[in-house]
Amino acid sequence: MSYLAQITSPTLVLSERITRNNLQRMAIKAKTHGKKLVPHWKTSQSKEVGRWAREYGITEITCSSIKMAEYLSQEGWERIHIAFPFNVRELPKLNQLALQQRMSVQVVNPVTATLLARELKAPIDFFIEIDAGYGRTGVQFSDTATIDSILSIASGCSHLQFRGFYLHPGHTYYGKDNFKIHQESRNALKSLKDRYNILYPKLLTRLGDTPGCAVVEDFGEVDELGPGNFVFFDLMQVALGSCRKEDIALCLAVPVVDIQHSRKEILIHGGGVHLAKDVLVQADGSKNFGEIVLLHDQGWTIPKHYSYVKSISQEHGIIQASEELLASVQVGDLLG
């Protein structure tokens, strides 16, 4: 039986071929530049895709929570890093997880470092998260007093090992000058490595964001790359210039429940619950929550005619449909 015939409600469809191509491409890029690829797994969140990743030499991953790390543990990863300022209320869970999986966490203040040093029961590595302009979280790269304080606290605990500096230049997602942002980020990490390398000769620097890692060709002295969205990509990454539409490895199969020919609209069962509410603003000011592809048993085809999801609520989605799509679709069909 066709897999499409088994779909009755909004269903995620993944292309293994495209996913593997994306993993291989980024792995080759990292290797070509002499960097270690440690991808962020918060988008893919899949043990199976992780097994594919290891076929391309990927041995460590990053996630965003203890819960996700628990799910991904015992899958053969050399280390799982939690790339979110460590939540000290989860120390008991971290202690338990660290007994079965090598872990590293992110520290952004001396208070967290103190609690970790006092209560850890198993060895844990840590990165100090650095802010070089994004402004969301992290220690300002020029705030060496805070960095020194964190390192001093950690030096008194045999279970807490300094691994290096982590920087996520998330402002590349706002369509600014990605090359300039990456240059500033590399410079910040280099200045810190130059300052602390004598005391910590094995310290690493890690830079992670898909828009930058996908297009930049000069990573300087950064040791590790940590992009995440590149595994599947999406329309936002297309808009940022990170990839082509053909590189997007996911779509959502949705049932057609109504068609309004006079308004050129198609109502689908697929809304914010299924698509999230990320949105692209088009040149005419209209909102685009996703573009339509045509499903078949081998995956999907990107049509030459353009149709897109113009609005969503929790369960509903409304497609602004092309004439060609309106002429070919019926209530009960599936679209991607």
Residue map of PLM features:
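Generic N-terminal amphipathic, Lys/Arg-enriched alpha-helix
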Residues: 1-14
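Alpha-helix-loop-beta-strand connector modules within alpha/beta enzyme cores
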Residues: 23-32, 39, 47, 56, ...
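Active-site-proximal beta-alpha core segment in soluble small-molecule metabolic enzymes
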Residues: 38-175
